[in-house]
Amino acid sequence: MDLNFDLYMNGVVEQARNEIENAGYEQLTTADEVDKVLQQNGTSLVMVNSVCGCAGGIARPAASHALHYDKLPDRLVTVFAGQDKEATQQARDYFEGYAPSSPSFALIKDGKITEMIERHQIEGHDVMDVINQLQGLFDKYCDER
């Protein structure tokens, strides 16, 4: 049996993109798109997506379920580490004081990083832990919807 690795990975990436987009996150694929969103006033939750197991098993489900809450960011966006490299690097430029990490979440307010949930706060935790961390950020920085 001959398995085409690129074809397989394209399917994995497409599924990961669709999963987060179906949860209501806008995919940013260029540096210009990142700047256009993150320079706006208000709050933006950035999910740095990836194909690793903790992204699919923990981060993306948490990103979706955390939205069933009274307080929410103004915008939900995602960049894909290892896929949309320009957009991911541009987003990471906003994450001042934090090392590159994927999967991860960053809450940006008025163009500045407030806090970040890094991979080490996701990997090895259960989905509910990450939901609670996200909703804690929403409580602290976001308005009721």
From Swiss-Prot:
Could you state one GO biological process linked to this protein?
Answer: cell redox homeostasis
Q: What is stated as this protein's family in its record?
A: Belongs to the bacilliredoxin family.
Q: What are the TM regions of this chain, as residue ranges?
A: none
Protein name from the UniProt record: Bacilliredoxin SH1401
Family annotation (Gene3D superfamilies):
Glutaredoxin
Give one Pfam family, short name only: Disulph_isomer
NCBIfam families per the UniProt record, alphabetical: YphP_YqiW
Q: Which InterPro entries match?
A: BrxB/BrxA
